[in-house]
Amino acid sequence: MTAGRGDEDSLAAGGPARHIPVLRDEILELAAPQADGLYLDATFGAGGYSRGLLATQGARVLAIDRDPGAIAAGAGLIAESNGRLTLVEARFSDLAAVAERLGLGAFDAALFDIGVSSMQLDEAARGFSFRFDGPLDMRMQQSGPSAADIVNDADEEALADILYYFGEERASRRIAKAIVMDRAKAPFRSTAALAAMIARVCPGKPGDIHPATRSFQALRIAVNDELGELVAGLAGAEARLKPGGRLAVVTFHSLEDRIVKLFFAGRSGRGEAPSRRLPGEPIPPPPTFAVSGRQPVTPSAAEIAANPRARSAKLRHGVRTSAPARAPGRDLMALAALPQRAAKGR
């Protein structure tokens, strides 16, 4: 999608949304679009990757995005594509069902660009950003609980867990306690009010990221179940890729990258136990992906200079084998969900 995926301080460095796809050349080189190929752009956004794929005459693209605004903005590219682009409002977890409903065959490549986009962050009314005053919303689709619902209704322990596990916020307990105390006087309704409270409780040092960065990331991930959707999307792509098809995933923070890294390690056999096994020990399933080359791929110095918002991007990729797809393991599901009990000592 666009250049603005990642932590919001990286996004602020780039200014207003410029709709520049991150690692575009590397992604398209991996996808290697062909005239008779079918490709998945799982995060349409401003259409940067889809446009690159469609530049190959005869290539067809299924693009999905859970943001209705992105779908509406894609009407022009649909018209330009002469029927080669199908754009659907859907989540990652809907991917396989959408492809099945449309009667599509297996994909030659599947491309993911994970996280919130610069367009979403730069629109104050969406409530994603601490840089603008807007409603405390953060929903990519206008359904389900908002960030305000979580902040005003969740108990202190649940809030601390969300901030700690989804934002890697060390001051999670302090911030959660302050939220509960302040909301007793008046509920939080705006991004500015929440950001100001966090800055008051955890004032940063000059040169540090904004004190609210990690908390806003955590709330956004919780509101949209971003990590659970990522796991579902990886599994859906595995099920719909043809042998030899490529899966390429760009992430912008450590939680996402950890899931993608673990997925490829487990699916390629790199995460399995040594070849010598005890009698009766189960044989691991055959690899569903082949992974090669130095990974992750990161933006060049020239790309970062031209587009500072790209600086935290990491690209991991693999080639689909003919082995049957399988359900995500418990290790992946555990990374995508909050632990049942809060971690102690934080």
Swiss-Prot record:
> In this UniProt entry, which cysteines form S-S bonds?
none
Per the UniProt entry, what species is this protein from, by scientific name? Answer: Methylocella silvestris (strain DSM 15510 / CIP 108128 / LMG 27833 / NCIMB 13906 / BL2)
Q: Composition bias, kind Basic and acidic residues: at what positions?
A: 270-279
What family does this belong to? Answer: Belongs to the methyltransferase superfamily. RsmH family.
Which Gene Ontology terms describe the biological processes this protein takes part in?
Answer: rRNA base methylation
- Pfam families given for it? Methyltransf_5
Keywords attached to this Swiss-Prot or TrEMBL record, sorted alphabetically, are: Cytoplasm, Methyltransferase, rRNA processing, S-adenosyl-L-methionine, Transferase
* UniProt-recorded Gene Ontology molecular function terms: rRNA (cytosine-N4-)-methyltransferase activity
Q: Which InterPro entries match?
A: RsmH, SAM-dep_MeTrfase_MraW_recog, SAM-dependent_MTases_sf
> How would you classify this enzyme at the top EC level?
transferase
Where are the annotated segments for Disordered?
A: 270-346
Name assigned to this protein:
Ribosomal RNA small subunit methyltransferase H
Does the record's keyword annotation contain S-adenosyl-L-methionine?
A: yes
Q: What is its EC number?
A: 2.1.1.199
